[in-house]
């Protein structure tokens, strides 16, 4: 990018009055032609909540939760897919394809459907049914591959080369991280350009954390922020090749995909170099969390913030919690945790994390018994009676 030129075209004052509340409000920082229309679905400008109750529980001064699960297909991946659709439009493509553990697939299918494009989606057979249902609803041709994500990726790569489809795979298409970087641009604008100490995010193939870091560096280059935050790379213990590389100082090696957090279960990360560079350049922290810690974070976010994240979506928050418990985050720190996907994408694991509802017949005595059996007492709330007022006409 020509940052000197961008400085003449984009100012904080211009952004403040811009009405486009989507990722495309930052067009000057995005690699698209001026004449290229933004794709139909409104992606981005997701809410940033100040999570005071959760911050208090974790023992830190300020915590913000960026809920990217409210995007059109319910994940941060919509940012990459919106960019992919825009670039496919520029290329005159009518068919787009990708491989995915779930979120990138549903994201591409939805964004492409809105733009009138055909999609071919390759998913590993373990992909949650909720995500596959999204694909089918959006009219995608879905190929469920009986194998690992690595095998799924290789098959999609061969098919794309054979039939000449536009490639949305993150490792192949460099524009996708440019779409994902908008989450970082939004965080900083929503914080009124005040830089947090840390940004915590879940990591799978590495494209998201690499994009986040690129966006922050762009803002620093044009003078919108005066320093850069440290990144927190959170991975599942059962699949953490990138974090393990940082911890050991050795090159990354493939791992088995052994975690319920399907969206980050990537044993062979395709954006490893960019992700590792982002973590190292930011002097970032790495943390690996168990499936049990991930499920606990689902409950914690839901009950303190009202945010419902899928397992992979809350892994950043789970990692932050673990680091706080280990004393690695200072009590006066300001932290942003990015929730990358909505919990409705994986209802089965949400139920496993939070339990089943109380099931009884329509009987008050049975209700009281159920409360007592669960160690609960029904709250007694006395409502203040308000006298009726006479109406005069």
List where the protein language model places each region:
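PLP-dependent amino-acid enzyme catalytic core
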Residues: 1-393
